[in-house]
């Protein structure tokens, strides 16, 4: 039987724990109240103004129900607003508020520091290989996820 400490799944889970801890520490250092999924949502809404919740969930690979709670908390904090779509009265579009845009701008340099923290033990060449392999594995396993990423990179119809 393989040692737990050599199993890819265990190591990936540990790295995720470390990444979340680093994110929380950097946000606390910056005095910002933001989680990794909230940052992903704000960043994606910024890049896709008027996105609907189902599309947003696909763009950040999160299940719709959980993301609904995330969007609700962002709305309660005054960081996003949901509006009835002019194209489809049944749909609700999500947009950043000025406060959401300001928070995203303030968080960006700290998020960049977190990313550097995560891979600081690797040299430049190792980082490139590591990120390439992570992308390869996540792309290859995307359809097996309970919340697959849905964007231009993973949509075969757009390739």
Question: Where do the model's predicted regions map?
Answer:
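Active-site phosphate/pyrophosphate-handling residues
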Residues: 10, 40, 55, 65, ...
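Alpha-helical structural segments
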Residues: 14, 18, 46-47, 62, ...
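Short amphipathic alpha-helical segments with heptad-repeat character
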Residues: 9, 13, 17, 61, ...
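N-terminal helix-turn-helix DNA-binding core of bacterial DNA-binding proteins
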Residues: 21-66, 147-151
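DNA-binding alpha-helical recognition surfaces that contact promoter or target DNA
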Residues: 58, 69, 132
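Short amphipathic alpha-helical interaction elements located at domain edges
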Residues: 127, 140-159
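N-terminal leader segment of winged-helix/HTH proteins
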Residues: 1-33, 44, 152, 158-159
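Charged, amphipathic alpha-helical coiled-coil/dimerization segments
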Residues: 50, 72-139, 158
């Amino acid at each position: 039987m393989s040692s737990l400490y050599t199993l890819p799944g265990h190591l990936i889970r540990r790295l995720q724990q470390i990444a979340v801890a680093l994110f929380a520490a950097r946000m606390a250092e910056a005095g910002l109240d933001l989680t990794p999924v909230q940052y992903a949502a704000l960043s994606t809404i910024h890049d896709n103004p008027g996105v609907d919740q189902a599309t947003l969930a696909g763009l950040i690979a999160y299940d719709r129900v959980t993301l609904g709670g995330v969007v609700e908390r962002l709305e309660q904090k005054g960081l996003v607003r949901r509006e009835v779509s002019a194209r489809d009265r049944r749909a609700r579009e999500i947009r950043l508020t000025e406060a959401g845009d300001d928070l995203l701008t303030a968080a960006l340099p700290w998020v960049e520091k977190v990313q550097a923290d995560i891979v600081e033990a690797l040299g430049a060449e190792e980082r490139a290989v590591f990120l390439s392999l992570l992308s390869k594995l996540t792309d290859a396993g995307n359809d097996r996820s309970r919340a697959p990423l849905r964007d231009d990179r993973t949509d075969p119809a757009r390739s």
